[in-house]
UniProtKB/Swiss-Prot annotation:
PANTHER family xref list: MITOCHONDRIAL RIBOSOME PROTEIN L39/PROLYL-TRNA LIGASE FAMILY MEMBER (PTHR42753), PROLINE--TRNA LIGASE (PTHR42753:SF2)
UniProt-recorded name of the protein: Proline--tRNA ligase
EC number: 6.1.1.15
Gene Ontology terms, MF aspect: ATP binding; proline-tRNA ligase activity
Length: 426
């Protein structure tokens, strides 16, 4: 994509009321703009990142046999009244009425809808186990939205729901989703720490939160340092991970902690996912059942959430420097930034145009503007593409281009042929 034809409204200065790094860089790099308190528009560059994260999530979910659906944003209030949760959400849930004066809600989550869906469509126990997921916008009227897309009122979420015939099968589904989440986060360049958590208004009696370590995090985590190696091991052992000590601040007790204090790490963390075993909380109140051997039984359920739009902010929090964002390759809006330092030089112009054509517009953001070299380099660092391809003085004098890695700042000099052979296929 040619920068001259693209829309990236960058900011030179940080707005006065913005302090968190992810909020600063998501505004300055033109990913988002605020429309109202806690509500943001996603601009072209930010939407590309959002879609790339969504694609990683969908690939891992689909690979594990989990089926995608799409459920409505607007839900009948009667379903929430039936489940008993209508009053639990209080002012966080946006309540509306349609033209016929029927009470509706703008869904903050979808347990009621999916339970209703299964109780009216499940025809046989042979359809179990079943896990359905969606990627859908949600709205929760946060009292104090802050930190930009890290804690906003409207957000994109991947939520999944499992249905099983008994407890053992439900725990198998829970463990499968646990593993899928680790695989998703690792592909995004993150190391997730799973901690046992309170189920809150979602319900159930087993729950884990997934956090990434970040100094800006709101949570305080205590964990056995061995868990990092377990998470990053190619052979993910869920039982070992679940049995390794981790705890949020409210559940940690140094006096009763089962492992030596010397092996405990304390860090700040950002929550990026949450999984729950719900048991029959919803199936019992909403009569979601199946029949086997002429016996009617309640469905065992689980639910699993990842804040997709929140992940954009979380990734920036752990992947940036003083100059801007450092996107992991898997989700970067473009793999390459192509900069022609001598745009008036015919040779540099021709080489840049040739590289742009061969790389393809989906892989490269080509700075074809007439801006100064300093502005181009500063913008390149701010936007954070993994690789910076620089056409300049070395190109003219030696026929070589400079390829600089954004994360390490290390540069390589090579011919255009070497570059295309080494990088285009990767």
């Amino acid at each position: 994509m040619r920068l001259s034809k693209y829309y990236i409204p960058t900011l030179k200065e940080t707005p006065a009321d913005v302090s968190v790094t992810s909020h600063v860089y998501s505004l300055r790099s033109g990913l988002i703009r605020q429309v109202a308190s806690g509500i943001y528009a996603w601009l072209p560059l930010g939407l590309k990142v959002l879609k790339n994260i969504e694609n990683v999530i969908k690939e891992e979910m689909n690979k594990s046999g989990i089926l995608e659906v799409l459920m409505p944003l607007i839900q009948p209030a009667s379903l929430w009244q039936e489940s008993g949760r209508y009053n639990d959400y209080g002012s966080e849930m946006l309540r509306i009425k349609d033209r016929n004066n029927r009470e509706m809600v703008f869904g903050p989550t979808h347990e009621e809808v999916v339970t209703d869906l299964l109780r009216t469509t499940l025809t046989s126990y042979k359809n179990l186990p079943l896990i359905l997921y969606q990627v859908q916008w949600k709205f929760r009227d946060e009292l104090r939205p802050r930190y930009g897309i890290m804690r906003c009122r409207e957000f994109l979420m991947k939520d999944a729901y499992s249905f099983d015939k008994d407890f053992n099968s439900a725990i198998e589904s829970y463990n499968l989703m646990f593993k899928v989440y680790i695989q998703i986060f690792r592909r995004l360049g993150l190391t997730p720490i799973a901690v046992k958590a309170d189920s809150g208004p979602i319900g159930g009696n087993l729950s884990h939160e997934f956090h990434i370590l970040a100094n800006s995090g709101e949570s305080t985590l205590y964990y056995d340092q061995d868990i990092i190696n377990l998470i990053n091991n190619d052979n993910i052992d869920i039982e070992k991970i679940k049995n390794t000590y981790t705890a949020a601040d409210d559940l940690h007790n140094s006096e009763t902690c089962p492992i030596p204090a010397s092996n405990i790490k304390k860090s700040k963390g950002i929550e990026i996912g949450h999984i729950f075993y719900l048991g029959d909380k919803y199936s019992k109140t909403m009569n979601a059942v199946f029949s086997q051997n002429n016996e009617t039984q309640l469905l065992h359920m689980g639910c699993y959430g990842i804040g997709v739009s929140r992940l954009v902010g979380a990734i920036i929090e752990v992947s940036h420097d003083n100059n801007g964002i450092i996107w992991p390759e898997e989700i970067a809006p473009f793999k390459f930034s192509l900069v022609n330092v001598f745009s008036a030089n015919k040779e540099c112009h021709n080489i840049s145009e040739n590289l742009y054509a061969k790389l393809g517009s989906n892989d490269v953001l080509y700075d074809d503007t007439e801006d100064s070299t300093g502005i181009k380099f500063a913008r390149m660092d701010l936007l954070g593409m993994p690789w910076q391809v620089i056409i300049g003085k070395t190109t003219i004098e030696h026929g070589l281009i400079e390829v600089r890695q954004r994360s390490s700042k290390k540069s390589l000099l090579m011919s255009t042929e070497q570059f295309l052979n080494n990088f285009k296929k990767s």
